[in-house]
Amino acid sequence: MNEKHPGPLVVEGKLTDAERMKLESNYLRGTIAEDLNDGLTGGFKGDNFLLIRFHGMYQQDDRDIRAERAEQKLEPRHAMLLRCRLPGGVITTKQWQAIDKFAGENTIYGSIRLTNRQTFQFHGILKKNVKPVHQMLHSVGLDALATANDMNRNVLCTSNPYESQLHAEAYEWAKKISEHLLPRTRAYAEIWLDQEKVATTDEEPILGQTYLPRKFKTTVVIPPQNDIDLHANDMNFVAIAENGKLVGFNLLVGGGLSIEHGNKKTYARTASEFGYLPLEHTLAVAEAVVTTQRDWGNRTDRKNAKTKYTLERVGVETFKAEVERRAGIKFEPIRPYEFTGRGDRIGWVKGIDDKWHLTLFIENGRILDYPGRPLKTGLLEIAKIHKGDFRITANQNLIIAGVPESEKAKIEKIAKESGLMNAVTPQRENSMACVSFPTCPLAMAEAERFLPSFIDNIDNLMAKHGVSDEHIVMRVTGCPNGCGRAMLAEVGLVGKAPGRYNLHLGGNRIGTRIPRMHKENITEPEILATLDELIGRWAKEREAGEGFGDFTVRAGIIRPVLDPARDLWD
């Protein structure tokens, strides 16, 4: 096998059971409708347990009380997580009021969880409320279709409130890409919205009868911001503008962060540059990338099924040539672009249309009424009077967008009274965690519940070493699936067991380098002792403007990951 074509285009062998399930599901229907009426269990049975993921839901249970319920001979306290499809994170205030009401009245936890994929999740939906949540979303023009499992997930778009025209154009493309790659099956409408079954055969011209080999993630990125972390995604359209107007995209393919502890066949990978394309080819190219991965992705091993592994197996040039063939185009050379940061600018920013945008820091994206900080009530009050929209960011924050000067003081007053504008350190603003315990079935260690007190300790270290005005991009993910995007952080903690994490160092501020494991299976005191020493060295030895991650590489503390498929585990 030569370098250009290092491996087979299609992996032969026994297909995974997930492939059987999809094939037999009758285009994602399964027996979900019948299962809904089974009151003997709070969960979904058999294939339906996995099929509901295509409808935007995961079956979970409260792991804090799992053992206690088992002792009482009770089944786990099953409840669903539902994730909304919300391209670019834009939600109207009318929609916000509807989701606020549902969260308060029909979920166990009463919260709205903003995610780092620019949407919101409900946690703790009991089976009896599953159909009503889909109907509520539909009534305000939303849905949960294709936000989980083997499809193109929620499409991200840079939350850029400064260049309003460019953002508007990029956002429209994010919506178009999302719509174009949606499944065509009528299963969602039939099961949840009671729409009549039509006497036609379902067809999936893009996704195919067995859909994609694995999850697939897409972004639209507006440099110089990399807030959406493009290298965590399968397909990325980097906006190229001339005179403030969008003219085309650079395409980058094959990013992804999920690994498995100890499995050296798995690795995080940054996306590869394919080339530049004019706007009119965007949908054809998006479809070509997806169908190439559909046909060439590994359906015999789900741990090796994502686009990043397909690219490494067949070769970047081979994959790129196939995309060109299917789309009927030739990529132009990559146009120049650069990233300067990926954090949100917290507070007020004036847009070019004389409207104001207020970015609110929401720790871990969890919107709830806390003692003395009624965040959820405050946002509801703002939603009732605000004429613009809300935008969820990929950093789990919320932008009150398009505020006229005349409304600014009123909205700020509510935000301040609700604790939505409490001062936080730059370090806290640049730290993030996935949900993890108690609801995530894959969690190995705490993440969301661990982060606030952990950052208290990091803030103390930053103050001790005189760098409180600085920040380190710091992320915690409860398991190596990597939802917290720790594998693109300057300091990444990956859960290994309760109270234990792998410590990764050497990523950079702009999110273009994968960090390497520095220490394995260590406790919080060990993490803090390590970081105390390293932050102290960074404070004294850094060069002007040098971020912590770049410093750890330059100082020889960690070797940079240059080719993750080959050297991540070295």
From Swiss-Prot:
Asked if the Swiss-Prot or TrEMBL record annotates the protein with the keyword Oxidoreductase, the reply is yes
Amino-acid positions noted as binding [4Fe-4S] cluster in the UniProt annotation, renumbered to this chain: C434, C440, C479, C483
One GO MF term attached to the UniProt entry: NADP binding
What's the catalysed reaction? hydrogen sulfide + 3 NADP(+) + 3 H2O = sulfite + 3 NADPH + 4 H(+)
| The protein's required cofactors | siroheme; [4Fe-4S] cluster
Annotated signal peptide: none
Q: Name one GO cellular component term.
A: sulfite reductase complex (NADPH)
Entry-linked Gene3D superfamilies: Sulfite Reductase Hemoprotein, domain 1 (3.30.413.10)
Per the annotation, how and in what number is the cofactor bound?
Binds 1 siroheme per subunit.
Q: Name its pathway.
A: Sulfur metabolism; hydrogen sulfide biosynthesis; hydrogen sulfide from sulfite (NADPH route): step 1/1
Record-level GO BP terms: cysteine biosynthetic process; hydrogen sulfide biosynthetic process; sulfate assimilation
| Residues annotated for siroheme binding in this entry | C483
Q: Which Pfam families match?
A: NIR_SIR, NIR_SIR_ferr
- Enzyme class label: oxidoreductase
Among SUPFAM superfamilies, the record links this protein to: Nitrite and sulphite reductase 4Fe-4S domain-like, Nitrite/Sulfite reductase N-terminal domain-like
E.C. no: 1.8.1.2
Q: Which UniProt keywords apply?
A: 4Fe-4S, Amino-acid biosynthesis, Cysteine biosynthesis, Heme, Iron, Iron-sulfur, Metal-binding, NADP, Oxidoreductase
Q: Which family does it belong to?
A: Belongs to the nitrite and sulfite reductase 4Fe-4S domain family.
What is this protein's function per UniProt? Component of the sulfite reductase complex that catalyzes the 6-electron reduction of sulfite to sulfide. This is one of several activities required for the biosynthesis of L-cysteine from sulfate.
Cited NCBIfam families: CysI, PRK13504.1
Its subunit composition reads: Alpha(8)-beta(8). The alpha component is a flavoprotein, the beta component is a hemoprotein.
Protein's UniProt name: Sulfite reductase [NADPH] hemoprotein beta-component
Taxonomy of origin reads:
Bacteria, Pseudomonadati, Pseudomonadota, Gammaproteobacteria, Enterobacterales
